[in-house]
Amino acid sequence: VFLFAISAIEVIIGILEMKRYFHEELEAVRSHLMEMGERAVESANLALRALEQRDLDIADSVIEGDDMIDAIETRIDEEVARYISLRAPVAKDLRLLFVAVKASHDLERVGDEATSIAKRTKKMLSSNETYRGLGRVPDMCELAISMLKEALLSFIQEEEDIAHQIIGRDKAVDALNRENFKEFVELMKDDPSKVDVYAEMIFISKSFERIADHAKNISEEVYFLLTSQSLKQVIKEETKS
C-alpha cells in the first residue's frame, strides 16, 4: 500500500509538472506574439519617420529590423507545432494556437510593408528628387498603427469589444488612400519630371492601407479566439437588424 501511495503521488506530481510545462509553452507563444506585434508597430512608425524626415539611416534600421520579425514568426510556428505534437490541445488552447499562427503571419506582412516603404523612401532620396508634401500619408499611418495597437490590446486584455470596434475603421484608411492617389496624380500632372517620385508615394500610401488591413485581420482573429464566432458574420447580422 505504501509503495502504491508513493507511485500515485509520483504520477500526480508528473501530471502537475506536465501541466505547468504546457502552460509555460502557451505563455511563450503569447509572449512572442506580443513581442512581434511591438516590433511591427515600431517598424511602421520608423518607416513613416524615415519618409517625413528624409532619413536614410532610419530607413536602413527598418530594413535591418525585418529579419528579427521574420525570426519571431518562425519561432512561433515552431512552438505551435511542438505544442500540438506533444498533446491534443483542448478547444480553447487550439483556438489560441490557431490565432497565434494567423496573427503572426499578418504581423510579418506588416513588417514587410514597412520594409517596402523604407526601400521606396531610400529610392526617392537616392535619386535626389524632392517631393512636395506627403498627402494624407501621415494620417493613414497614424490610423493604421492605432488599429494595430488596439488589435494587440484586445488580445492582451482579452476584450472582444476592442476587436469589434476596429472593424470599419479600415474604410477610413481606404478613403485616405483614394485621396492620396488623386493628389499624387495631380502632382504628376503639375510636374511630369516628378512622375517617378509620386508613383513611389502612391505605392507607399498603398502599403499603409495594407497595414490597416492586417490590423483588421488580427482583430477578427482575436474576436474568434475570445468568442468562437466570426466577427464578419456578427457584423453582417448587426447590419441587418
What feature does the model see in each segment?
Residues 1-17:
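N-terminal amphipathic/basic-hydrophobic helices that include classical n-h-c signal peptides
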Residues 14-241:
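Cytosolic, long alpha-helical scaffolding segments
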